[in-house]
Amino acid sequence: MKRLLVLTLVGAALGLAQAPSPEVLQGVGLEETLALAKRWREKGERVVSYVTPEAFFFEFPDGRKARVALGEAFLLAVAPYRQRTHPCQVHYFSSCTGELREETFAVRVLEGNKEVLRTQVRTGKDGFFELWLPRNRRYTLEVRQGDWVAQAPVATFRDSPTCLTELRLSRR
């Protein structure tokens, strides 16, 4: 029994440590695809990964490529900042870096005067947090951290940016 348990645990660990490849992405959901893109960056894997309004794209070290369609979802990567940012339209999980890493923010998303989302988020080691939003809509995004606030219009159309880096926090 102990040997079976050890073999099971070793097998599970090997599955988690599986090298990045298109096969790893087969059959996984959107949340897991996002988690893999972020994990591969944090582990220093040489995988180029980015998201457009239509899909996740991956380019692996061996030259193979993969695409995971977003369907009805739209993924917006957001990097609030105080002093330093970069221009961005398409979010590259493999290289985009925001200023405020591993920090917590209060987020509200409004459609007109109607609040459609209120949540707490934490930026990752890359300085970004991600929001899943319905497609083909216009919103106002509000981000707060203590008495620091930023607000910006965002859209989720097929030509909309997937990377928001111009969300400057100001004291209020």
Role assignments for model-derived ranges:
Residues 123-131:
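Glycine-centered loop-to-beta-strand initiation motif
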Residues 19-81:
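N-terminal secretory signal peptides
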Residues 68-70, 74-82, 158-172:
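Extracellular beta-sheet/turn segments enriched in Thr/Pro/Gly and aliphatic residues
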Residues 146-152:
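Short acidic/polar inter-strand loop motif in beta-rich domains
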Residues 70-124:
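Mid-length scaffold segments of soluble, non-membrane domains
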Residues 137-146:
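A short, solvent-exposed beta-strand micro-motif common in secreted/extracellular proteins
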Residues 130-138:
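Short Pro-Gly-centered beta-turn/loop motif in secreted/extracellular proteins
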Residues 4-13:
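Sec-dependent N-terminal signal peptides
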